[in-house]
């Protein structure tokens, strides 16, 4: 807090980066975060070894599936869940500009993961969507009567992209994939737009989240966090909205097994997509049961949150 408020009490601006286990941040030092925000602190909180399944060998004590939700409650906190290095760089640049160019008293909370993955080139014009909270990373490969939209965040985005490819090749489903860098920022603008529309009935505006997801295409959202995080934008999603999350206790196992257990892996995304289409009458009855059997997914398992 002293470093984050030095611009005020010492007229010596600093750019503090405080890196910690994401599980131990908002959960164990939340009072300090609130006090820092109330003191008009500026800086970056870096939630390292983030995610319920990414830190895969340390069980309940270290596996964070909820700090993004806790961060969303702090008015001055911007919470981010980047998937690629270019997203992280864009977010850091944006935060610096907000705090030191625009003199905004805000804290940026950024998820950092410890999983290696392929780094893809940044799409042209992606900066705007990254800062808004979501942007499209993969177009539908072909036109199809059946369409699905998949939202992914952090390391789970790679599974969303794999699922989209398999949906097209094996089921003829046209799929687009979005990287959601911040459900909190999408929600923040959505609430601002609702207030504007409530107070200005003749001057209605549409929030960015509605422009992205307000049509009737079924949407699947998946992340390494509990379902309540993607559910923050549910009211602005036009079509059916299915959320896959890591509700429950952390467990010690391989990432592959954990992601199958919490049903956020490629196969689980495919099943959720086919289910949305089958329920909407766009897939033959029995598609989900047949595909689940082929993939070895147990339809009658116990609730993973218990």
Locate each region found by the language model:
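Thiamine diphosphate
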Residues: 53-66, 72, 79, 87-91, ...
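A glycine-rich helix N-cap at a beta->alpha junction
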Residues: 34-52
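Histidine-anchored nucleotide/phosphate-binding helix
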Residues: 1-5, 29-33, 162-166
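Active-site nucleophile and cofactor-binding loops and adjacent substrate-binding regions
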Residues: 18-26, 48-50, 56, 60-61, ...
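A short, small-residue-rich loop immediately preceding and capping a beta-strand
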Residues: 10-23, 44-47, 152
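Alpha-helix C-terminal capping segments
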Residues: 1-12, 35-40, 72-74, 234-236
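Extended, hydrophobic alpha-helical segments in both membrane/secreted and soluble proteins
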Residues: 15-20, 26-32, 36, 67, ...
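Short glycine-/polar-rich loops that comprise or flank the Walker A/P-loop
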Residues: 40-44, 76-77, 217
């Amino acid at each position: 807090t002293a470093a984050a408020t030095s611009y005020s009490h010492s007229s010596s601006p600093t750019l503090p980066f405080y890196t910690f286990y994401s599980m131990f941040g908002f959960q164990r030092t939340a009072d300090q975060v609130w006090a820092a925000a109330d003191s008009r602190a500026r800086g970056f909180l870096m939630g390292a070894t983030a995610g319920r399944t990414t830190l895969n060998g340390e069980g309940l004590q270290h596996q964070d599936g909820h700090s993004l939700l806790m961060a969303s409650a702090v008015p001055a906190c911007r919470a981010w869940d980047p998937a690629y290095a270019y997203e992280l760089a864009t977010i850091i640049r944006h935060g610096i500009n907000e705090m030191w160019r625009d003199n905004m008293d805000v804290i940026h909370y950024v998820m950092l993961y410890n999983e290696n993955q392929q780094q893809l080139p940044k799409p042209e014009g992606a900066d705007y969507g990254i800062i808004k909270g979501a942007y499209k990373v993969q177009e539908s490969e072909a036109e199809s009567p059946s369409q699905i939209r998949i939202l992914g965040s952090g390391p789970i985005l790679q599974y969303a992209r794999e699922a989209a490819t398999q949906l097209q090749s094996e089921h003829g489903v046209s799929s687009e994939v979005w990287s959601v860098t911040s459900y909190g920022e999408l929600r923040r603008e959505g609430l601002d737009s609702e207030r504007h529309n409530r107070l200005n009935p003749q001057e209605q505006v549409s929030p960015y989240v509605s422009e992205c997801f307000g049509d009737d295409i079924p949407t699947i959202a998946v992340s390494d966090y509990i379902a309540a995080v993607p559910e923050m934008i549910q009211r602005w999603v036009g079509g059916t909205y299915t959320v896959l999350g890591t509700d429950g206790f952390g467990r010690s196992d391989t990432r592959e097994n954990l992601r199958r257990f919490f049903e956020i892996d490629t196969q689980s995304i495919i099943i959720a997509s086919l289910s949305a289409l089958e329920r909407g009458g766009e897939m033959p009855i029995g598609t989900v049961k047949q595909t689940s059997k082929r993939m070895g997914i147990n339809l009658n398992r116990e609730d993973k949150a218990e």
